[in-house]
Amino acid sequence: MKYKVITTFKPGDWDRYAKRMVQSVLDRWPKADITVYCEGQRPNFNDQRVTWWDIDKANTGLLKFREDYRNDPVAVGKLDEIPGGIRRSSRLETEGGLDAKKESYLWNAVKFSYKVSCVTHAVRTYTDYDYVIWIDDDTYTFRDIPMQFIESICPNDTLVTYLDRENDRGSNKYPECGLVCYNIKHKLVQNFINDWEKLYTSADIFELLEWHDSYVFWHLTKEYRQKHSA
């Protein structure tokens, strides 16, 4: 099986933990092949198994989204509203949790759009691979990963594989998205990332109850289960 690992990190986090994450994948994953998306100047890290991409060039539609909304406090998780600006969903009055009236990353749509830039670019670009595997940059692989395990979480007939924790207890209603596997050969995978991207470029994301990566991903996977039995 041929797989591509992808990740990104915010400025200042390379030496903090992202470098350690990348090196651990190179050391512990079999036949590791990584693309790292970064902002600004790339770090001084040379390995032929690592490809670098400027994240702002990865998806111009999502770059425009960030440029349009990065100065709107509500779109970056704040409470201060500006005339004609974004507003949180009115559904929070009845469906919101303890953070509904607080500043929180749960509504930082701009921040989490960076991850979507990476995934959409990778799924569209690396079509000669079997799977694209997203791994958060603050993780660490501490033991060797057998290829058999990777194959077990990347089956031929599954659209996406993720860490499911859906239940009725607080924030655990939506997935943990620190590791997500995208089946490049699945007939719906391009539609999936197109729909994900469109939530941002159409600004429909702001109609959702929350705007962070796990909630938006959860929203999309539920739609695909209902419409496509995926």
Q: Locations of the language-model features?
A:
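N-terminal anchoring/stem segment of glycosyltransferases
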Residues: 1-101, 124-129, 184
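A structural signal for well-ordered alpha-helical segments within the folded catalytic domains
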Residues: 16-19, 113-117, 211-219
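Short beta-strand-to-loop element that shapes/binds the nucleotide-sugar donor at the catalytic cleft/hinge
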Residues: 151-152, 156-181
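GT-A fold catalytic core of metal-dependent nucleotide-sugar glycosyltransferases
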Residues: 107, 113-163
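Residues that flank catalytic or metal-binding motifs in active/ligand-binding sites
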Residues: 115, 135, 175-178, 213
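Short acidic-hydrophobic catalytic motif
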Residues: 104
